[in-house]
């Protein structure tokens, strides 16, 4: 058993918070942290007549109640929240394309003959100054720079006035050198703005900090509308909550950040963890402090001496003149003739560890590529652990292991399962399933609403979908709220008052097929089979049963030799049903984690059920057994295939009728002489359009859009109308008002406050935004007869047949199998449906290539179709085609991931390339970092040293970040771009 040792220390942010708020009156604190969580309150004091959130563990935290046993977080509206440390750039006077002058103007290069100057919010064209030759004096590449500036000057129609300030001339010189490639662009210098400083700045601006927490909209120094400052703590486990307090991010748009803001830098060694970061588009923009790294809590004092031969020196962006620096306490950066000294709070002080708390848990990281360590850092924070905080009755919706802390050491074998080599498909024993038994605690809390009914009792067993209780809130448009159970479970506790309710549900479960597991080496996979009769081997004459089987295909390309080292690198003869395998298999003990990604939380199916009374489409959400959305991209594929019968069947669920005057074409007018069947979505969009002054006429089977004549609408003196009829528009105090059923809570408030111009904007949003009626109801559709779950392999199935989750009888013999995002025509295939015995969707692995799917947690959808015409149509247009994959080239049941086996897999084209083999067993060799080649002499089998490992971290970060930076625009964004272009 591995025990997590999480210290309760801080890294300096608490001292900064205490310094800012040392004079706060502690008598203004009304509640304790536990009371705030129970009653959805905020743990605050009063400071300068404003609510000041109290940092848990600070000097203001007088209650000493610490629900998480951690320091540095806040409680807002009953939710534990962390505040990120924001990395802000220190000012340097030049970069590759701009220079900052002493008069606060900015020179920017767009191209060599197009330069601008920005001053006092005005941007004008800028030419070289009359004394441009003075710029060259400060260059080490005088000839090259002079030649270029001469060319630019020859195109100048008018020279700018001379620049006399020496620092300005130096800044321009260095800017031009960077632009021309004569000088390296200076690296980014930064400091961290911690929670205390952020909150102090907000209060200083006389703004509400609580509102910043609630809306997640902050101001960081001069940068407004920053949305990445505060986050709800996820409470997956203690190490995840700890790291959320030590998180660092950038204030700008993170998904669009350039590569230079994402890289692993030498200057960050022992300061910022090189492996723990988010993957995807945020890679490198979210990082974490190293294990014992701290930040400075006070502004430094420096000793300088005036000297004519000194450097132009700036201290915290204040110009000191030409000086010689006699202090070594601050960060000093000299760039030729300019010296920058940064001695402000928020600078990171090096520690003794290369990695964060999470990264330091990886004992064999030097035997693995850093990219695998990056993945496993994220998985550790998602692991189900045995911490008592997360199994109690404090936090909402938590999971915890009943036995163990961070996973369990299991007896592992690296081998195929009866000749089937299916990557990421894990086979476990029934014993392991029970060993990882976990407890889920679900807490329902209601405050300041009237509790009408509670329909359950203590110790009662609950089934998913059961009605738990009913509340009444007159402040909402939907005043009565029914709350249903999202999971099976047992009622542990009920506390009921007139306007307060706490209801606790407990569920214990074993691991089951479809749950996700991972080693500490990034070898993740889905439990695909729970086997009673597992293989075994003999150790000192005693029979040792295998707990978990991982496929050898997982090793050649991932190169995770650290897992083999952890297992002891031993090979033994393994027996399957008393038959001895011909070759020895790698076996040994290895730590495995059970992750939060469990099939219980993902499986969803529906044959019929509740329909939204307004949209007439199935309700949404797993807890209400809602329908799945057949989206815009899926619709476009059917249109591209010409599958009109299938489209008609899928879009036929919300049929409704409208009345039409054939003479005028008006819909639901005072006169009508015919009825027409149409989708309910049409009526909803029509109402929004009419509210915005537009109408649709249907005449002679053609439509036109005209201005809306609202003269025939009835007038009303109340806003409470239109509970069900979506076309029930009325005139209220001179404006066209939507019925209640189409109003959002915010729109209703705008109507009440008579803010009609803002109400018009809200109606436009309700119609046209990404979550608006047109996109959600017209471009896509929620459907009945649908299934969604995790996919697992079943090689015994026919290629065109799949097994659906147990109990998911959707009344269809055929269905459309789909994996989102649907990027091409192969993303939808017609398959036969067969009842399964698990909660997963089982498919033949030969289907994977078509959907670009694998078995590490991917989910797929099934949309059932019944009409004979649709089925016959899709048999022709979306027929399943067998694709041979790498998993089936080798047909050996005694393959393993030793040196011989890895080479065999590579040579036979099964998995990996020859360079993988060389990296593992010979030499990593040349790698490229920021367009520079370096040579790594070590290999993973012999463990690369810390210096080489850090260099490989740079490579891993650059490769991972480049994927998000260089990903082409697809789908919805592409449609927007095309529309803008046209």
From Swiss-Prot:
InterPro entries, A to Z: DNA-dir_RNA_pol_su2, DNA-dir_RNAP_su2_dom, DNA-dir_RNAP_su2_hyb_sf, RNA_pol_asu, RNA_pol_bsu_CS, RNA_pol_N, RNA_pol_Rpb2_3
EC annotation from Swiss-Prot or TrEMBL: 2.7.7.6
UniProt keyword RNA-binding present: no
Any Pfam family matching the protein: RNA_pol_Rpb1_2
Keyword Mitochondrion: no
One record GO biological process: DNA-templated transcription
GO molecular function, one term: DNA binding
GO cellular component, one term: mitochondrion
Catalyzed reactions: RNA(n) + a ribonucleoside 5'-triphosphate = RNA(n+1) + diphosphate
Keywords: DNA-directed RNA polymerase, Nucleotidyltransferase, Plasmid, Transcription, Transferase
Root EC class: transferase
Function, in words: The presence of the two linear plasmids, termed pGKL1 and pGKL2, in strains of Kluyveromyces lactis confers the killer phenotype to the host cell, by promoting the secretion of a toxin able to inhibit the growth of sensitive strains.
Protein family: Belongs to the RNA polymerase beta chain family.
Protein name: Probable DNA-directed RNA polymerase
Species the sequence originates in: Kluyveromyces lactis (strain ATCC 8585 / CBS 2359 / DSM 70799 / NBRC 1267 / NRRL Y-1140 / WM37) (Yeast)
């Amino acid at each position: 058993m591995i025990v997590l040792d999480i210290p309760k220390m801080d890294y300096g942010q608490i001292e900064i918070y205490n310094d800012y708020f040392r004079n706060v009156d502690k008598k203004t604190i009304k509640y304790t942290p536990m009371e705030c969580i129970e009653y959805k309150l905020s743990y605050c004091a009063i400071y300068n007549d404003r609510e000041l959130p109290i940092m848990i563990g600070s000097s203001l935290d007088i209650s000493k109640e610490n629900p998480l046993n951690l320091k540095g977080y806040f409680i807002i509206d009953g939710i534990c929240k962390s505040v990120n440390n924001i990395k802000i750039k220190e000012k340097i006077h030049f970069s590759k394309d701009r220079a900052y002058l002493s008069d606060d103007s900015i020179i920017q290069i767009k191209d060599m003959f197009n330069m601008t100057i920005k001053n006092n919010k005005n941007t004008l064209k800028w030419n070289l100054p009359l004394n441009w030759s003075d710029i060259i004096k400060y260059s080490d590449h005088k000839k090259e720079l002079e030649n270029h500036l001469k060319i630019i000057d020859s195109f100048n129609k008018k020279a700018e006035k001379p620049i006399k300030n020496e620092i300005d001339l130096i800044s321009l010189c260095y800017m031009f050198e960077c632009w021309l490639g004569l000088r390296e662009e200076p690296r980014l210098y930064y400091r961290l703005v911690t929670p205390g400083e952020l909150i102090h700045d907000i209060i200083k601006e006389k703004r509400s900090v609580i509102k910043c927490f609630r809306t997640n909209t902050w101001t960081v120094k001069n940068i407004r509308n920053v949305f990445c400052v505060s986050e709800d703590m996820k409470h997956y486990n203690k190490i995840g909550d700890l790291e959320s307090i030590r998180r660092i991010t950038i204030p700008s748009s993170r998904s669009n950040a350039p590569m230079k803001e994402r890289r692993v830098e030498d200057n960050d060694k022992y300061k910022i963890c090189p492996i723990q970061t988010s993957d995807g588009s945020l890679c490198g923009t979210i990082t974490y402090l190293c294990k014992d790294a701290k930040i400075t809590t006070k502004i430094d004092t420096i000793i300088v001496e005036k000297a004519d031969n000194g450097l132009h020196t700036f201290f915290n962006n204040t110009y000191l003149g030409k000086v010689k620096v006699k202090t070594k306490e601050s960060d000093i950066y000299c760039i030729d003739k300019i010296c920058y000294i940064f001695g402000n709070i928020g600078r990171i002080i090096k520690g003794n560890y290369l990695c964060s708390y999470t990264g330091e848990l990886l004992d064999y990281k030097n035997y693995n590529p850093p990219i695998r360590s990056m993945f496993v850092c994220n998985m550790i924070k998602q692991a189900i652990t045995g911490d008592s905080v997360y199994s109690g009755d404090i936090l909402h919706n938590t999971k915890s292991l009943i036995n163990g802390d961070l996973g369990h050491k299991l007896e592992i074998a690296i081998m195929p399962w009866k000749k089937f080599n299916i990557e990421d498909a894990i086979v476990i024993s029934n014993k392991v399933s029970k060993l990882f038994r976990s407890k889920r605690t679900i807490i329902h809390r209601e405050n300041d609403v009237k509790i009408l009914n509670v329909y359950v009792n203590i110790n009662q067993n609950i089934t998913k979908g059961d009605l738990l209780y009913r509340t009444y809130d007159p402040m909402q448009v939907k005043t009565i709220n029914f709350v249903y159970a999202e999971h099976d479970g047992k009622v542990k506790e009920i506390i009921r008052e007139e306007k307060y309710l706490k209801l606790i549900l407990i569920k214990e479960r074993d691991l089951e097929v479809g749950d996700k597991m991972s080693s500490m080496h990034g070898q993740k996979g889905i439990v695909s089979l729970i086997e009673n009769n597992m293989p075994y081997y003999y150790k000192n004459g005693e029979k040792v049963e295998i707990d978990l089987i991982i496929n050898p295909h997982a090793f050649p390309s991932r190169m995770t030799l650290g897992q083999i080292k952890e297992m002891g690198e031993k090979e033994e003869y393994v027996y399957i049903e008393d038959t001895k395998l011909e070759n020895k298999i790698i076996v040994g003990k290895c730590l495995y984690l059970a992750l939060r990604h469990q099939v219980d939380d993902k499986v969803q199916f529906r044959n019929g059920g509740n329909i939204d009374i307004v949209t007439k489409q199935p309700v949404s959400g797993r807890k209400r057994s809602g329908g799945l959305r057949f989206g815009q991209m899926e619709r476009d594929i059917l249109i591209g295939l010409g599958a009109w019968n299938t489209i008609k069947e899928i879009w036929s669920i919300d049929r409704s009728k409208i009345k039409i005057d054939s003479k005028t074409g008006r819909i639901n007018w005072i006169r009508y002489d015919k009825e027409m069947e149409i989708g309910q979505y049409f009526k909803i969009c029509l109402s929004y359009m009419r509210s915005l002054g537009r109408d649709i006429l249907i005449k002679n089977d053609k439509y036109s859009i005209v201005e809306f004549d609202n003269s025939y609408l009835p007038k009303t003196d109340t806003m409470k109308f239109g509970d069900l009829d979506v076309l029930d528009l009325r005139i209220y105090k001179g404006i066209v008002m939507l019925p209640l059923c189409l109003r959002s809570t915010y729109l209703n408030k705008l109507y009440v406050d008579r803010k009609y111009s803002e109400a018009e904007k809200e109606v436009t949003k309700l119609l046209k935004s990404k979550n608006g009626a047109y996109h959600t109801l017209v471009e896509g559709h929620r459907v009945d007869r649908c299934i969604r779950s995790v996919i697992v392999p079943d090689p015994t199935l026919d290629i065109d047949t799949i097994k659906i989750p147990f109990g998911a009888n959707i009344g269809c013999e055929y269905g459309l199998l789909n994996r989102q995002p649907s990027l091409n025509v192969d993303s939808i295939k017609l398959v036969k449906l067969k009842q399964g015995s698990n909660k997963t969707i089982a498919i033949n692995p030969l289907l994977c290539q078509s959907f670009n799917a694998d078995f590490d947690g991917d989910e797929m959808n099934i949309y059932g179709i019944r009409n004979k015409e649709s089925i016959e149509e899709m048999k022709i247009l979306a027929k399943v085609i067998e694709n041979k994959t790498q998993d089936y080239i080798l047909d050996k049941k005694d393959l393993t991931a030793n040196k011989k086996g890895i080479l065999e897999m590579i040579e036979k084209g099964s998995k990996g390339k020859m360079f993988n083999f060389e990296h593992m067993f010979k030499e990593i060799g040349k790698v490229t970092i920021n367009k520079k080649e370096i040579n790594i002499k070590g290999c993973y089998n012999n463990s690369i040293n810390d210096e080489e490992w850090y260099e490989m971290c740079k490579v891993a970060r650059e490769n991972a970040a480049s994927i998000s930076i260089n990903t082409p625009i697809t789908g919805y964004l592409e449609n927007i771009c095309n529309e803008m272009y046209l």
